[in-house]
Each structure stands twice: as structure tokens, then as C-alpha cells.
């Protein structure tokens, strides 16, 4: 396993220029999920990811339509009996580039300055999507795949993933795994890989509090009849 790891790292290093070129190509797609004018770009980005999976020779690759933007799925099975399964989550949508005046270059024309690459989505999270895909490529080129791997790459993370819950509910068997990996986090330092193991999600609630049907005199009823505003403050 150690030799395979070393070989994979060597492969990644020798193919770094190509990997970077492909990332730049991905970054030129303005896959802005909040903007209806970019619906075609969302489909283009989803197909681009699916094409990456196909080029790797994954066992199954599919672009699933949703009520919003597509979900891209891919999986590759290990030949090792009883191998664990990891599900890698990612998203191909990005935030709008506005305010444009804060950019020194076009947000969708990647520019490299030293070791840094500047473009919308470079770090959130097209860079991580490509890094994960290319890491798998490096492993496959250097030996056998030790685990089963699945990818779920959505296009609505930047708008709260409104259709992801339903998609997951409908495909529980397909998405079954031993653990999940979300590379959409930060690092302590550029040269120190970091795993975030407690990441909060989103939860939406609507609270309704019913009170008196008409105004009550605060001097007479204050403190006796619970004020809905006070009850809400206590709940929050």
C-alpha cells in the first residue's frame, strides 16, 4: 500500500500541468445556480463532470435531472471482496461574480499568480471536485482500487440544495455507503491537509405562536397573560 501511495503521488506530480489545465477549463463555465440566465451553463458543467467520470472508466455514470439543476452521479467498485464504500459529495455551482469591481480580472477567466489560481469556484468548490477526481485517477494508474467509491456532485449547494433531499430519499440504495467525504472545507495551512469531522448543515423552521385575540392592557394583564413576543424570545 505504501508503494502504491508513493506511485500515486508521483503520477499526480508528473501530471500536475494537465490537471491544472482541466481545472481552468472547468472554471471557465459560469455555472451560477442563482441566475436563470445560466441554466444552460449549469447543464454544461454537469456534463463536464460526467465526462470526467467517463474518462476515468467508472462503472456507472449518470446525470439526473431534478426540479432545479442536475445531479451528477458516478461509482466505481473495487475488486477487493468486502471493501468499504465511500461517498464523495461535491457541487459544481458557484456564487455570482458580483460585485465585479472587486475583481482585478474576469471571474471566469482563470489567472495564475505564483502558486495561486484566481477564478470564481476555484476554492468553492470546483478545485476540490477536480482534486478528488484526479486523486482517484492517480490511484487507478498506480495499482488496484482498495475501496468502492461513489460520487454525488450537485448543482444547487449555493442556493441551499432545495432538491437534494428528495433526490437522496429516492436513491437510498444507490447512495448507500460506509462513510461520506465532503471536501468542501478549508485547510489549516496550504501545506497541511485538514479533515473537518463536524460540519453543520442547514435547517429551516417556521414557528407560529398564538396569543390573545385582541389587545390587553399591559398594566392589568402584563405578566399574567403570556406575551407572544416574549414567548418567541424565550424560544429563540
For each feature predicted by the language model, list its residue ranges.
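Short, conserved micro-motifs enriched in small and acidic residues
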Residues: 115-130, 158, 222, 226-230
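Broad gene-expression machinery/nucleic-acid interaction feature
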Residues: 71, 148, 202-204
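Acidic/histidine-rich catalytic neighborhood of metal-dependent amide-processing enzymes
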Residues: 123-198
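Fold-independent oxyanion-binding glycine-rich loops
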Residues: 90-92, 114, 155-156, 183-185, ...
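Flexible loop/turn segments at secondary-structure boundaries
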Residues: 35, 70, 95-96, 158-161, ...
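Midchain, well-structured core segments that form catalytic/ion-binding scaffolds
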Residues: 165, 172-236
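Acidic/His- and Gly-rich active-site-bordering loop/insert found
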Residues: 2-120, 139-145
Amino acid at each position: 500500500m505504501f508503494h502504491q501511495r508513493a506511485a500515486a503521488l508521483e503520477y499526480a506530480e508528473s501530471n500536475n500541468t494537465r490537471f491544472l489545465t482541466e481545472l481552468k477549463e472547468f472554471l471557465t463555465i459560469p455555472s451560477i445556480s442563482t441566475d436563470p440566465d445560466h441554466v444552460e451553463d449549469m447543464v454544461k458543467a454537469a456534463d463536464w463532470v460526467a465526462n470526467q467520470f467517463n474518462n476515468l472508466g467508472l462503472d456507472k455514470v449518470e446525470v439526473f435531472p431534478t426540479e432545479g439543476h442536475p445531479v451528477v452521479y458516478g461509482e466505481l467498485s473495487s475488486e477487493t471482496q468486502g471493501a468499504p464504500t465511500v461517498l464523495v459529495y461535491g457541487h459544481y455551482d458557484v456564487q455570482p461574480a458580483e460585485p465585479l469591481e472587486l475583481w482585478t480580472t474576469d471571474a471566469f477567466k482563470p489567472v495564475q499568480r505564483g502558486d495561486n489560481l484566481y477564478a470564481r469556484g476555484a476554492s468553492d468548490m470546483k478545485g476540490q471536485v477536480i482534486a478528488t477526481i484526479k486523486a482517484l485517477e492517480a490511484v487507478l494508474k498506480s495499482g488496484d482500487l482498495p475501496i468502492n467509491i461513489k460520487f454525488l456532485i450537485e448543482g444547487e449547494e449555493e442556493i441551499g440544495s432545495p432538491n437534494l433531499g428528495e433526490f437522496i430519499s429516492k436513491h437510498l440504495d444507490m447512495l448507500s455507503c460506509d462513510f461520506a467525504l465532503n471536501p468542501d472545507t478549508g485547510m489549516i495551512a496550504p501545506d497541511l491537509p485538514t479533515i473537518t469531522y463536524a460540519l453543520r448543515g442547514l435547517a429551516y423552521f417556521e414557528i407560529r405562536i398564538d396569543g390573545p385575540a385582541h389587545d390587553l392592557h399591559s398594566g392589568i394583564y402584563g405578566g399574567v397573560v403570556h406575551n407572544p413576543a416574549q414567548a418567541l424570545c424565550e424560544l429563540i
